[in-house]
Amino acid sequence: MIELTQEELKQRFNDKIFGQISETADALGLECYVVGGYVRDIFLERPSKDIDVVVVGSGIEMAQALGKHLGKGAHVALFKNFGTAQVKYRGTEVEFVGARKESYQRDSRKPIVEDGTLEDDQNRRDFTINALAVCLNKARFGELVDPFGGINDLKEKVIRTPLDPDITFSDDPLRMMRCIRFATQLGFYIDDNTFESLCRNCERIEIISRERIADELNKIILSPAYFFNTRVSAIRNPASCVPPSMVLMLFTYE
């Protein structure tokens, strides 16, 4: 991992598209942040094409305005049922979504969604390293927002949830598999509390569709650290604290 000053971080966002987003957001009077994996991968010096932008307001309005600002070379796709939009411009794809807060019923992965703040949006993220945000508004361009110590967790190579892991995993059980995936892909260690919660909540994986499980499982098995991560080794062992159903779900999936 590399350490960056705000000025150095700002330079990582010198691509034209970020300047255009900044101008558009300021014109609309909307707060706008790059969030998640793109920010994480800057600090890990990993290539990343997935640019996710959270708007405190309407992500669709922001995308439409940006498309007009960019002109003929821009293609805008709206997904109104999900409150999201995508802008493609000269080989770059940017996903826009309004900041939101979510709550879940125990028997469903479908969240109840409400408009929210950046803080609300970061609270709903799966892991601290994916809750990092960088402001794109001119007055704060390049400012890192890290409420959960995600940068320190990158330094320590730790996977940890921003909130109580029992809440994070119960709300969306697929995050348990994502936890394993990030540990194997990045060669990180799963935080003790997070791992213990994964063990407690693993039966919840049963509400996830087989297709989603298969997708995550493939990513786990293809990860370079799959056979060397001690925490994942524990999960592969049916005699470990993880119930057999989770082991079977992960490693005998057909």
Region spans (language model):
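Catalytic cores of the polymerase beta-like nucleotidyltransferase superfamily
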Residues: M1-A239, T252-E254
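Short, intrinsically disordered low-complexity segments enriched in Ser/Thr with adjacent Pro
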Residues: C241-M246
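Leucine-biased recognition of intrinsically disordered, low-complexity hydrophobic segments
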Residues: L248-L250
